[in-house]
Amino acid sequence: MLPLFADPPNPLLADSAPPVVDPLVIETPVLKRPIPSRRLIEDQRRAQSAAEAIAQLERDGCELIGLTRGQFSLSDLIEAILSKTGPAALSISTWTAAQSSVATMLQLLQSGKITRCRWLVDVTFVRRVPQLVSEIRRSFGDDAIRVTRTHAKFATITNETWQVAIRSSMNLNQNPRMESYEIGNDPELCRWLEGVLTDMWANQPRRLAEGSHSDQTQWLRVHG
């Protein structure tokens, strides 16, 4: 028995063996590479638009790294980049998305600026806004969405001449707070990110996104 005023034992310091994740569940190898030598780091908190922020994005140019005050969103960045790349396929990973941003992506698809769009969202997104999950599937295709436990926000915009990778703190919604982004025409990183998503699309049943919470939890517990 513990003394009357003794602190309870810290479970983080217990002698039990730590949980081990089988590395074989990660199909895509880790990408290791040196820090890019060509980077443009800018404070874009005074930029008036996403188009202004990515004005120096070039196919053979440097990586753009910036901070915003939330004056433009991830969907604004995607739209501005598409104005440079021309029609392209889009892949998105986000913890959440606003209906207005989903509508913007649909407008880009209908206008031909997006040729294909696939969505990786957090499993809680399905419980929070199930109507948006159904709308994404209905608007972008039956195979357009997968779920996992994720907080990663990234996107790829690819066609025959551009392979743009976007890494950001932004979800696919309007958030008037300081946000960060890293954007560049980066074939190597695009291949890696696309490989991660392709593994998920190949291994997860397409209907899991609209399954019950217990079904999703059980599947993710087994398959990760």
Sequence positions of predicted segments:
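Extended interaction regions within the primary functional domain
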Residues: 34-41, 88, 110-118, 140-145, ...
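Primarily the HKD phosphodiesterase
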Residues: 72-140
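N-terminal localization/anchoring segments of enzymes in phospholipid and broader phosphate metabolism
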Residues: 1-88, 110-111, 158, 163, ...
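Short beta->alpha linker loops
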Residues: 69-73, 96, 149-151, 188
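Amphipathic alpha-helical interface segments
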Residues: 184-224
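Conserved beta-strand termini and adjacent loop/short-helix elements that scaffold enzyme active sites
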Residues: 67, 120-122, 147-150
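Generic detector of well-ordered alpha-helical segments enriched in charged/polar residues
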Residues: 51-55, 75-79, 106, 130-137, ...
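HKD (HxKxxxxD) catalytic microenvironment of the phospholipase D
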Residues: 3-6, 90, 142-197
